[in-house]
């Protein structure tokens, strides 16, 4: 176990709190004008999936569990869960629906992801920062809108809604940020 300050905790980290392992779902640092800065952390207990919210002063020490981050390639999904393969030794790992969470919408066959593994158990998944998806449907452009400040809603091929610039039409492939579902650019392929 490694002690780190609370302000350095990030999404996907695995913490040891009171002898139990937790995966960090969100971590935010708050710096009020008056008072002590704090870090608000939402976590999921690995053993039973219970969600917990903790608040620490940013300078407090928290224990980070030793987790091995390994590149895995996504293969397929079935009733057991999501199957990944380690390209270095061809070992296969099954990741549960609970561990995957809402990130499953971005998984594409053959995609390389980083799995955080603790004692042989996959705890968290880190997707690539950007994925390329196709726009399935989008609303027509309203005449008179300027291109600089307006975005229009669009549906991606994975079922997620996002906002895109007015010049993007259905059938266009775009690059999307997996962290916040935001449009990055038109795909260059």
Curated annotation (Swiss-Prot):
Pfam families the record matches: EFP (PF01132), EFP_N (PF08207), Elong-fact-P_C (PF09285)
Keywords on record: Cytoplasm, Elongation factor, Protein biosynthesis
Pathway: Protein biosynthesis; polypeptide chain elongation
Stored InterPro entries: Elong-fact-P_C, NA-bd_OB-fold, Rib_uL2_dom2, Transl_elong_fac_P/YeiP, Transl_elong_KOW-like, Transl_elong_P/YeiP_cen, Transl_elong_P/YeiP_CS, Transl_elongation_fac_P
Domain of life of the organism encoding this protein: Bacteria
CDD domains: S1_EF-P_repeat_1 (cd04470), S1_EF-P_repeat_2 (cd05794)
Keyword field contains Cell membrane: no
Molecular function in Gene Ontology: translation elongation factor activity
Gene Ontology annotations for the cellular component aspect, listed alphabetically: cytoplasm
Localization, UniProt: Cytoplasm
Cleavable signal peptide: none
Alphabetical list of NCBIfam families matching this protein: efp (TIGR00038), PRK00529.1 (NF001810)
Role description: Involved in peptide bond synthesis. Stimulates efficient translation and peptide-bond synthesis on native or reconstituted 70S ribosomes in vitro. Probably functions indirectly by altering the affinity of the ribosome for aminoacyl-tRNA, thus increasing their reactivity as acceptors for peptidyl transferase.
Family per record: Belongs to the elongation factor P family.
HAMAP family: EF_P (MF_00141)
Protein name: Elongation factor P
């Amino acid at each position: 176990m490694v002690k780190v300050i609370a302000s350095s905790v990030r999404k996907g980290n695995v913490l040891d709190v009171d002898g139990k392992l937790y995966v960090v779902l969100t971590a935010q640092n708050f710096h009020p004008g008056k008072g002590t800065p704090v870090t608000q952390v939402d976590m999921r207990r690995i053993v039973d999936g219970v969600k917990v919210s903790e608040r620490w002063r940013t300078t407090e020490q928290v224990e980070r569990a030793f987790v091995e981050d390994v590149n895995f390639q996504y293969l397929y999904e079935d009733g057991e869960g999501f199957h990944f393969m380690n390209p270095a030794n061809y070992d296969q790992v099954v990741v549960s629906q609970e561990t995957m969470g809402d990130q499953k919408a971005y998984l594409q066959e053959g995609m390389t992801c980083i799995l955080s593994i603790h004692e042989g158990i996959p705890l968290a998944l880190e997707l690539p920062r950007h994925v390329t998806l196709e726009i399935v449907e989008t609303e027509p452009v309203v005449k008179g809108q300027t291109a600089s400040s307006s975005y229009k809603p669009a549906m991606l091929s994975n079922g997620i809604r996002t906002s895109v610039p007015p010049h993007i039409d259905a059938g266009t492939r775009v690059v999307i940020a997996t962290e916040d579902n935001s449009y990055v650019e038109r795909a260059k392929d």
